[in-house]
Amino acid sequence: MKENIKVSTAVSWTWLSILVVVMVSTNLRSPITAVGPVLGQISEDLQLNSFQSSLLTAIPLFMFASCSVAVSRYSHKLGMHRFLLFGLMLLSVGIVLRVWGNMPTLFVGSFLIGLGICVGNVVTPGYIKTSFPKQIGLMTGIFAVAMNLTAAFASGFSLRLGEWTGLGWQGSLGVWVILALLSLIVVFFDGLGRKKAPGITENRQATSGIGYIFRSRLAWYISLFMGIQSLIYYSLISWLPNVLVDYGMPKEDTGWLLFLIQIAMIPIMFIGPILAHRMKDQRLMATAVAIGMLGSIFIFWHYKLQGIYVAAVLLGLSNGLSFSLSILFFTLRARSTANAIKISGMAQSVGYFIAAFGPPVFGRLHEIDATWNYSFYFLAGSIVLLLFAGWKAGEATYVAED
């Protein structure tokens, strides 16, 4: 009888752990992807120039870069649930401040949003490795799909949400606080249940420092792969609506093209990690990512609105696979949960530092060349570096532990 109760309790908390992964992941992109379609409204309302506008996307990325190492160092010592709760609280406050209606709170809110998302970015891969050690590929796929499905809706419905709420861009961006608060409740009950339920523990332990990770060549390749694929993603999420408007697309249709890109990412983000987990190494997948990205960038640049939907789907597939590979590398290249979190911390710190330069550089190159040619050359060169880093990170080996 007692054994049946233990089994039933363990199954219940397994489902709750799945819900934690899903709910946390839904908050890790949507507050950022919702910005692109309403960026023009924000700039007009608050009188922002091009550089200030690009900071709305760049600030969260700089926060990912500056805080990921600290989060990875202390989360395993102090508890993943505490950090997730703290991150969701920061995210909720940041969303509210960002839509307050003036420039200072706009940027302070963006700062807090970046810090809150940083916690989820770093800790969730470790949570997956701890809670689902035998289903890493599957749970990474679920994590990536949930993240990008909500990101797709955030970009596709951003303008509509502003119209439906009657609050304009403030409604478009503010509505996401509801999801953050619901996620906070789920994480709270999961942590509470692990304290009370028999046999359900968080596996908290003291770990060595993170410095040795930065001496690993493999960890640097993983970080570069993470950074360059994020740079490409955030550059296009931020500026593609403006590019398409210059090409002649109606402004109201640009959000739907971003929606199509995000939707195209979803199938490959679910299937990709499962297949990659079963492969001897992931170098072939890294090559496929680079080919797909180069193809989509070429169509956007050369054919403009002709073949635009083919380019969008191709970009979604290649970007979806590149992101899932990045997250999967954190766990596949680590022998322990502690090491997975440290690799995640380094990769996201270095990676998002690289990515944060994407939107400002892409926008600055457009100021130099109004045809967007220089901006697309910048992305093409980045993809070549992505292929090199992916080929190295895809080798079947481990980051050595201290």
Where are these regions (language model features)?
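Conserved MFS/SLC helix-loop-helix module at the cytosolic interface between two early adjacent transmembrane helices
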Residues: 66-104
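Intracellular juxtamembrane helix-capping segments at the cytosolic ends
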Residues: 119-132, 321-335
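A late C-terminal transmembrane helix in Major Facilitator Superfamily
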Residues: 334-372, 378-379
